[in-house]
Amino acid sequence: MKTSLRLTSLALFMAAAMTASAQEGKPWIHDPSTIMQCDGKYYTFGTGGGGLISADGWNWYPGAERPGGGAAPDAMKIGGRYLVAYSSTGGGLGGGHAGRILTMWNRTLDPKSPDFGFTEPVEVASSEVDEDCDAIDAGLFMDPTTGRLWCTYGTYFGFIRIVELDPQTGARVEGNEAVNIAIDCEATTVIWRNGWYYLLGTHGTCCDGVNSTYNIVVGRSRNVTGPYLDNMGRDMIAGGGKMVVDAADRQFGAGHFGRYVEDEGVEKMSFHWEADLDRGGRSVLAIRPLLWENEWPVAGESFTSGVYEISSVRRGYALELAVDFVRHDIPRSRWWEASDEPIASYPNQTLEEVKDTWPEGEIPARIGDWMNRPHQRWTITAVPEAGGYLGGQYYKIQIEGTDRVLAAAKDAEVTVAPSFTGAAEQLWRIEQLTDGTFRIMPKEVPGTDRQYVLTSIADSTPTLAEYDFNSDNCKWKFIRK
């Protein structure tokens, strides 16, 4: 019996860990490209050719097609076409550093489309056998301030370099000279935000499974060609770099950063784990929230099931079941009198003490002072069969110890239903925003096809409304209990 209990506990632990850390399906990939969306599906390419496709952003399966083989591709949509860059040889393969960076175009990423077909690849950079740079690990960047297209490449065997490409052809700009911008990293890419260019690179040892020390670091510059300095003022050309994400509890070797901007204040970062212990030590696709702290990118945490206080950022009040307040029958301290009586420890109010005072059927939701009472404690549980969205799955939000669940209702209202049916209005998308707070979005709202989020329309009144990152009404915090 003890052995059985131990095995059951281990299975539950591993299931929770998998839920927290990995995409579902068969997300096996190494060196994933930046995630692209095409005709309602998500795509990423990896080393060796091919890649993954997802219909919802959570369940990933093989199926993406990319000719040319090679290593560490990247992808970008420019106008109505997709530009894919990849490297041929390089990386110290065969004992040398000879390599080539190539680019090619496609009108679609869907291999089943009649429009699918890559153009002939064009060489945009190369390296010689004994050169101090490897032409490998391409990263594409379109400067939103100038419309100029750039490509970084290189590994920790030498310099990271940046070259300019023609956004119309994908070819190297004539006469452009490569600029050295970093050392001691690989799998680089540039992103832009609020006047800063950020160079993200993968530092550490690669390709050794659970023993890989891969981690993702960053520096920033006011110019696309550098210098890129970290938070301590160290230049990445001298080995600097501020940590963005490193190993997790059961996942190791974070590498090959990609950024996906879904909405204002909603950003995701993609990368691979070199080894996921809960997935047989395989290299897997990972997607995390991308946060920004003091103008530096930081990896957020994937949301996990548990018991939570759901606190409105608007005022700090807690989401609750709208029932009558039941006084906790604990003697009041006579603080004005001295006493030598022993100090007692009293329990919190329990569900059994109050549940019979609650009405049957549907009950409205409300926001009120946090008192750690049963009508304020929410058990949040993943619903795997409901699918997901980019980087996350849907959850049910229920009053702890009961069947009562939070639900979207007609006229963009929010209520608490008596039981969970699996209906779309009872499924919730919980996404961490770039400032660390969360938005809570029902999968569907009865009577409309518009997307709404849980909103504090007043200090004590929750409703559903359009998302506005600049309003604290739309933001929530989850405090684990």
Give residue ranges: language-model regions:
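Bacterial N-terminal signal peptides that target proteins for export
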Residues: 1-9
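Residue-level detector of beta-strand face positions
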Residues: 33, 74, 123, 189, ...
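Hydrophobic h-region of N-terminal signal peptides that target proteins for export
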Residues: 11-21
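Conserved positions at the start
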Residues: 29-32, 70-72, 135-137, 185-188, ...
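Lectin-like carbohydrate-binding module/patch detector with strong preference for beta-trefoil
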Residues: 305-481
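Beta-rich carbohydrate-recognition and catalytic domains
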Residues: 22-136, 142-185, 192-245, 264-306, ...
